[in-house]
Regions:
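C-terminal "cap" of GNAT-fold acetyltransferases
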Residues: 147, 154-158, 165-167, 177-194
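A short beta-loop-alpha structural element at the N-terminal edge
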Residues: 23-37
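Conserved acetyl-CoA-binding loop-helix of GNAT-fold acetyltransferases
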Residues: 126-139, 166
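Glycine-rich phosphate/pyrophosphate-binding loop shared by adenosine-nucleotide-utilizing enzymes
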Residues: 22, 83-87, 113
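Conserved GNAT-fold acetyl-CoA-binding loop/helix
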Residues: 44-64
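Conserved beta-hairpin
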Residues: 74-88
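Conserved acyl-donor/pantetheine-binding loop and adjacent beta-alpha core of acyl/acetyltransferases
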Residues: 89-117, 125, 179-181
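A short helix-loop-beta-strand connector motif used in the catalytic cores of GNAT acetyltransferases and
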Residues: 67-77, 93-97, 114
Length: 194
Protein backbone atom coordinates (compact mmCIF):
# COMPACT_ATOMS: atom_id res chain seq x y z
CA UNK A 1 0.00 0.00 0.00
CA UNK A 2 1.20 3.50 -0.75
CA UNK A 3 1.37 6.24 1.86
CA UNK A 4 -0.48 9.49 1.31
CA UNK A 5 2.82 10.94 0.13
CA UNK A 6 3.36 8.06 -2.28
CA UNK A 7 6.99 7.79 -1.18
CA UNK A 8 7.35 4.40 0.42
CA UNK A 9 5.61 1.19 1.31
CA UNK A 10 3.81 0.82 4.58
CA UNK A 11 4.98 -2.22 6.51
CA UNK A 12 3.48 -2.20 9.98
CA UNK A 13 1.44 -0.05 12.39
CA UNK A 14 1.22 0.00 16.16
CA UNK A 15 -0.06 2.14 19.01
CA UNK A 16 2.02 3.57 21.82
CA UNK A 17 0.71 5.69 24.67
CA UNK A 18 -2.31 6.83 22.68
CA UNK A 19 -0.19 8.07 19.78
CA UNK A 20 -0.17 6.11 16.59
CA UNK A 21 3.31 5.10 15.52
CA UNK A 22 2.94 3.87 12.03
CA UNK A 23 4.48 3.67 8.67
CA UNK A 24 7.75 1.87 9.04
CA UNK A 25 8.73 2.62 5.48
CA UNK A 26 11.14 1.14 3.02
CA UNK A 27 12.60 4.29 1.57
CA UNK A 28 13.33 4.68 -2.14
CA UNK A 29 16.03 6.40 -4.16
CA UNK A 30 13.81 9.42 -4.76
CA UNK A 31 13.70 9.93 -0.97
CA UNK A 32 17.44 10.68 -0.71
CA UNK A 33 17.04 14.38 0.18
CA UNK A 34 14.52 13.59 2.89
CA UNK A 35 16.63 10.75 4.32
CA UNK A 36 19.78 12.85 4.35
CA UNK A 37 17.92 15.72 6.04
CA UNK A 38 16.70 13.32 8.73
CA UNK A 39 20.20 12.07 9.54
CA UNK A 40 21.64 15.61 9.52
CA UNK A 41 18.87 16.74 11.88
CA UNK A 42 19.62 13.76 14.13
CA UNK A 43 23.34 14.60 14.18
CA UNK A 44 22.61 18.26 15.02
CA UNK A 45 20.15 17.44 17.77
CA UNK A 46 22.42 14.87 19.41
CA UNK A 47 25.29 17.34 19.77
CA UNK A 48 23.94 18.66 23.06
CA UNK A 49 23.00 15.27 24.48
CA UNK A 50 24.63 13.06 27.06
CA UNK A 51 25.74 10.55 24.43
CA UNK A 52 27.52 11.51 21.20
CA UNK A 53 27.49 8.76 18.57
CA UNK A 54 30.44 10.25 16.71
CA UNK A 55 28.40 10.61 13.53
CA UNK A 56 29.37 13.51 11.26
CA UNK A 57 27.45 15.17 8.46
CA UNK A 58 28.64 13.85 5.13
CA UNK A 59 30.98 11.32 6.79
CA UNK A 60 28.61 8.89 8.51
CA UNK A 61 26.20 8.14 7.26
CA UNK A 62 27.79 9.25 3.99
CA UNK A 63 25.86 10.19 0.87
CA UNK A 64 27.31 7.11 -0.86
CA UNK A 65 26.14 4.82 1.97
CA UNK A 66 22.67 6.36 1.98
CA UNK A 67 22.27 6.22 -1.82
CA UNK A 68 23.46 2.60 -1.94
CA UNK A 69 21.10 1.67 0.90
CA UNK A 70 18.19 3.35 -0.89
CA UNK A 71 19.07 1.68 -4.19
CA UNK A 72 19.08 -1.71 -2.43
CA UNK A 73 15.83 -0.93 -0.59
CA UNK A 74 17.65 -1.45 2.71
CA UNK A 75 16.86 1.86 4.43
CA UNK A 76 13.86 1.96 6.75
CA UNK A 77 12.27 4.91 8.51
CA UNK A 78 9.51 5.15 11.10
CA UNK A 79 6.89 7.87 11.11
CA UNK A 80 5.13 8.87 14.31
CA UNK A 81 2.07 11.05 13.83
CA UNK A 82 3.34 12.15 10.44
CA UNK A 83 6.93 12.95 11.45
CA UNK A 84 10.02 10.88 10.84
CA UNK A 85 11.22 9.61 14.22
CA UNK A 86 13.80 6.92 13.43
CA UNK A 87 15.84 5.36 10.66
CA UNK A 88 18.05 2.33 10.10
CA UNK A 89 19.77 0.31 7.41
CA UNK A 90 19.55 -3.48 7.16
CA UNK A 91 21.94 -5.40 4.93
CA UNK A 92 24.59 -8.13 5.00
CA UNK A 93 27.70 -5.92 5.06
CA UNK A 94 30.08 -5.86 8.02
CA UNK A 95 33.18 -4.06 9.16
CA UNK A 96 36.39 -6.11 8.91
CA UNK A 97 36.39 -6.18 12.72
CA UNK A 98 33.55 -8.72 12.68
CA UNK A 99 35.92 -11.41 11.41
CA UNK A 100 37.54 -13.50 14.09
CA UNK A 101 34.52 -13.17 16.38
CA UNK A 102 33.25 -16.36 18.01
CA UNK A 103 29.69 -16.06 16.74
CA UNK A 104 27.17 -18.52 18.16
CA UNK A 105 25.80 -19.24 14.69
CA UNK A 106 28.13 -20.28 11.90
CA UNK A 107 26.33 -18.77 8.92
CA UNK A 108 27.31 -17.35 5.58
CA UNK A 109 27.02 -13.64 4.88
CA UNK A 110 23.55 -13.80 3.34
CA UNK A 111 22.08 -15.68 6.30
CA UNK A 112 22.84 -12.87 8.75
CA UNK A 113 21.11 -9.49 8.85
CA UNK A 114 23.32 -6.58 9.94
CA UNK A 115 21.89 -3.41 11.53
CA UNK A 116 23.51 -0.06 10.67
CA UNK A 117 22.84 3.60 11.46
CA UNK A 118 19.88 3.01 13.77
CA UNK A 119 19.03 6.42 15.13
CA UNK A 120 16.05 8.00 16.91
CA UNK A 121 15.46 11.75 17.09
CA UNK A 122 15.80 13.02 20.69
CA UNK A 123 12.14 14.11 20.79
CA UNK A 124 11.13 10.46 20.35
CA UNK A 125 13.72 8.86 22.63
CA UNK A 126 12.47 7.10 25.74
CA UNK A 127 9.09 6.38 24.09
CA UNK A 128 9.68 2.86 22.81
CA UNK A 129 10.62 3.93 19.28
CA UNK A 130 14.04 2.23 19.25
CA UNK A 131 12.51 -0.92 20.72
CA UNK A 132 9.88 -0.92 17.98
CA UNK A 133 12.58 -0.54 15.34
CA UNK A 134 14.50 -3.52 16.76
CA UNK A 135 11.28 -5.56 16.82
CA UNK A 136 10.91 -4.71 13.14
CA UNK A 137 14.47 -5.91 12.50
CA UNK A 138 13.62 -9.21 14.18
CA UNK A 139 10.39 -9.53 12.19
CA UNK A 140 12.09 -8.74 8.88
CA UNK A 141 14.93 -11.16 9.63
CA UNK A 142 12.40 -13.89 10.38
CA UNK A 143 10.53 -13.25 7.14
CA UNK A 144 13.82 -13.49 5.25
CA UNK A 145 14.73 -16.75 7.02
CA UNK A 146 17.91 -15.28 8.47
CA UNK A 147 19.82 -17.32 11.06
CA UNK A 148 21.02 -14.36 13.13
CA UNK A 149 21.07 -10.59 13.50
CA UNK A 150 24.36 -8.86 14.27
CA UNK A 151 25.39 -5.30 15.02
CA UNK A 152 28.08 -3.22 16.62
CA UNK A 153 27.66 -0.59 19.32
CA UNK A 154 30.14 2.18 20.04
CA UNK A 155 31.61 1.72 23.50
CA UNK A 156 29.82 4.05 25.91
CA UNK A 157 26.43 3.98 24.18
CA UNK A 158 24.70 2.74 27.32
CA UNK A 159 21.08 3.22 26.10
CA UNK A 160 21.76 1.08 23.01
CA UNK A 161 23.57 -1.59 25.02
CA UNK A 162 20.67 -1.84 27.48
CA UNK A 163 18.12 -1.98 24.66
CA UNK A 164 19.83 -4.76 22.71
CA UNK A 165 20.53 -6.83 25.81
CA UNK A 166 16.90 -6.46 26.97
CA UNK A 167 15.79 -7.85 23.61
CA UNK A 168 17.97 -10.95 23.79
CA UNK A 169 21.07 -9.84 21.91
CA UNK A 170 24.24 -11.33 23.37
CA UNK A 171 27.61 -9.62 23.60
CA UNK A 172 30.14 -11.63 21.62
CA UNK A 173 33.25 -9.47 21.70
CA UNK A 174 34.65 -6.00 22.24
CA UNK A 175 37.15 -5.02 19.59
CA UNK A 176 38.80 -2.00 18.03
CA UNK A 177 37.30 -1.14 14.66
CA UNK A 178 37.81 1.73 12.26
CA UNK A 179 35.00 3.85 10.88
CA UNK A 180 35.46 7.18 9.10
CA UNK A 181 33.46 9.09 11.70
CA UNK A 182 35.08 7.65 14.84
CA UNK A 183 38.52 6.47 13.73
CA UNK A 184 39.88 3.48 15.65
CA UNK A 185 37.83 2.89 18.78
CA UNK A 186 36.19 0.15 20.82
CA UNK A 187 32.97 -1.42 19.59
CA UNK A 188 30.89 -4.11 21.22
CA UNK A 189 29.67 -6.78 18.82
CA UNK A 190 26.23 -8.29 19.48
CA UNK A 191 24.30 -11.21 18.03
CA UNK A 192 20.72 -12.41 18.25
CA UNK A 193 20.26 -16.01 17.18
CA UNK A 194 16.95 -16.62 15.41
Amino acid sequence: AQTGLGRAEKIRRFWFGGEEMNRVLIMREKDFTEVKAFYWKLIEQMQGGSYLPGWEKGVYPSDIFLRESLRNRALYMLKCDGNYAAAMVLNHETNEGYSGTAWKVDADKHQVLIVHALGVLPAFQGKGVAKHMVKEVIRIAGERHQRAIRLDVLNGNVPALKLYESMGFEHRRTTQMFYEDTGWTDYLLYELVL
